[in-house]
C-alpha cells in the first residue's frame, strides 16, 4: 500500500501513480497520462486540463479544481458532445456490482466463504488481477467497503451505501474534498470545496409526506 503522507503537504516528489492498482488509471485522468492522444497536464497553466482554484461560481470547461479528471465509463473513440448531449451511453449497472451486492448479502447471512469468493471474483478478473482477500467478520466488511468504493467509484453508489450502512454521519461529518495543486513541478495538498460536509442523523429517514399527514390526523411528522 502506497504511503501518501508526503503528498499531504507540499512536495516536488512525483506521485507514485505507477505503484497503484490498475483501476486507478482506468478511473481518473491525471498529470502525465494520455487521453485522446494528448499528454494531460493538470497543473497551473497546463495546456491540456489546466488547474483552476475552487470558487463558488461557474467554471471554465476543460479545467480541474482537484488536479484530476474523470475517465471511468468514457470511451475515447465515442465521445462527441453537443451541448448537453453526448454519444456516450450511461452504464446503469455492471456485473461487478451484481457480484458485490451478492457478496454483501452472503456476509449478512454469515456465509463467509461465499462472500469471500464473490468479492475475489471482482478482484481477480482480467485487467485487474489482484490477489484475493481471506479476511472474515468485521475485517472482511472493512475490506468489502474499500473494494466497493474503488470498484464502483463515480457510479453513484457511495453516498447511498453510507446511508444504508448507517455510517454517513461518521464518515461525512467535518469531511472535506482534497486534491493536488501542481505548480512548476511542486505538488500542494489543498482543500477543493472550502467547507466542511455535514450529515445529521435525521437525514437517514425521509420525512412523511404532508399529504399523508393531512389524510390521517394520527400520523405525526418525525421530530427531526
Q: For the regions a protein language model found, what residue spans apply to each?
A:
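Flexible, polar/acidic helix-loop-strand segments at domain edges
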Residues: 7, 11-95
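Charged alpha-helical initiation segments
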Residues: 68-74, 117, 124-127, 149
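Alpha-helical structural motif
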Residues: 16, 20, 66, 118, ...
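Surface-exposed intrinsically disordered loops and tails
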Residues: 2-5
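Short loop/turn segments at secondary-structure transitions that flank enzyme active sites
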Residues: 30-36, 128, 150, 168
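Extended, hydrophobic/aromatic-rich amphipathic alpha-helical segments that build helical scaffolds
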Residues: 20, 24-29, 90-122, 141-151
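Long, intrinsically disordered, low-complexity segments
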Residues: 85, 90, 123, 131-224
Amino acid at each position: 500500500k502506497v504511503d501518501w503522507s508526503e503528498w499531504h503537504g507540499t512536495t516536488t516528489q512525483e506521485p507514485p501513480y505507477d505503484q497503484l492498482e490498475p483501476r486507478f488509471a482506468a478511473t481518473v485522468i491525471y498529470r502525465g497520462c494520455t487521453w485522446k492522444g494528448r499528454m494531460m497536464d493538470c497543473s497551473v497553466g497546463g495546456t491540456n486540463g489546466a488547474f483552476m482554484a475552487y470558487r463558488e461560481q461557474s467554471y471554465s470547461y476543460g479545467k480541474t479544481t482537484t488536479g484530476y479528471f474523470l475517465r471511468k465509463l468514457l470511451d475515447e473513440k465515442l465521445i462527441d458532445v453537443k451541448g448537453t448531449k453526448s454519444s456516450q451511453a450511461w452504464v446503469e449497472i455492471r456485473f461487478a456490482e451484481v457480484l458485490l451486492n451478492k457478496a454483501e448479502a452472503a456476509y449478512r447471512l454469515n456465509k463467509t466463504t461465499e462472500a469471500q469468493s464473490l468479492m475475489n471474483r471482482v478482484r481477480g478478473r482480467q485487467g485487474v488481477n489482484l490477489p484475493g482477500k481471506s479476511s472474515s467478520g468485521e475485517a472482511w466488511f472493512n475490506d468489502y467497503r474499500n473494494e466497493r468504493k474503488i470498484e464502483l467509484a463515480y457510479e453513484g453508489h457511495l453516498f447511498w451505501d453510507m446511508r444504508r450502512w448507517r455510517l454517513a454521519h461518521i464518515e461525512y461529518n467535518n469531511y472535506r474534498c482534497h486534491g493536488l495543486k501542481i505548480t512548476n513541478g511542486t505538488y500542494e495538498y489543498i482543500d477543493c470545496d472550502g467547507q466542511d460536509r455535514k450529515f445529521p442523523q435525521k437525514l437517514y429517514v425521509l420525512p412523511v409526506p404532508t399529504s399523508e399527514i393531512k389524510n390521517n390526523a394520527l400520523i405525526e411528522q418525525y421530530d427531526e
